[in-house]
Amino acid sequence: MKNVVGKTLVALALVAATGAQADEVVRLGNLKLAHFGAVSYIKEIAPRCGIRVEEKIFAKGLDVMQAIIAGELDVGATASEAAISGRAGGAPIVVVAGFARGGARLVARPDLKLTNVAQLKGKKVGVTRGAIQEVLLMAELARNNLSADAMPGKDVQLVYLPFADLNGALLNRQIDAMMQSEPQSSQAINRGFGMEVMKPYGTAIGEPVRTMVMTEQFYQGRKPVAEKFMRCFVQATRSFIDDKALASKYVRDVVFKGQISADDFDDAIANSPFSYDITPQHIQATTDMMVKTGVGRMRAPPRAQDWVRTELLAAAKTSLQIK
């Protein structure tokens, strides 16, 4: 009888443990970009943090937002403009951290010998629609009094393509220049079919900060798990900042499966370093620039102070003794 009771208690304990473990799953949406590598690495160390992370890769940040709205994700890694557009469109999210800075570069065909934005007049420029690169491109064109549209007739003709297709378009001379992300812009330069014109960090946005967002339900309703995830994010990011060899190997071998070289990675991260922080001021400046340039076409732009929440990040950094 004692054995039966004992086995029953063990079985019940296993069921309870399984249920608790299921509650610890965090659904993460991410992008396949070099500076998103530390976010991918979270899933590798997640068991040490007491959670399990299920990562899903998307083509662009707006797709991450759609998955959040559909209830398919708890956490998303995007550029700030996708998060802002998502919040404006009803996505129930809060910004909780930044994880990389920069990550944009204007690259042109070497034979054109372009040295500044003003020389884009009469050219075809590729960019990914709705990405932070589009915001920065439109801001730089406006600073140089250049009009732009996807239809011919403006100073600059825009060609909208996914990040993965921009390099091929430049290589095949379908476009003259591109505002590209990393590591793709570094690849174009290192392989000789692209030349840097400029890094677009002279606008009010400065270096764009990539944003980590959580759903309000996850942030408020599963706070202990959200805290564990944030600590795991900080640990993963610190590992990549402190151990560049680890970061390079993981991004090249695991994220890109050998598609980029060590030089590509080094050059990419030099232009998009890993980081932790984000501020309401930065999100507001990006929001204001989106309104000014018309990217996102938001009816009611969200106020940054209403949805930037960095308390979990601050607590995680303090507990791990990171300034």
Where is each model-derived feature located?
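Bacterial N-terminal signal peptides that target proteins for export
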Residues: 1-9
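Hydrophobic alpha-helical targeting segments used for export or membrane insertion
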Residues: 9-15
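Pocket-lining segment of extracytoplasmic ligand-binding domains
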Residues: 81-82, 152-155, 159, 164-253
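Conserved C-terminal helix/tail region of periplasmic/extracytoplasmic solute-binding proteins
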Residues: 291-323
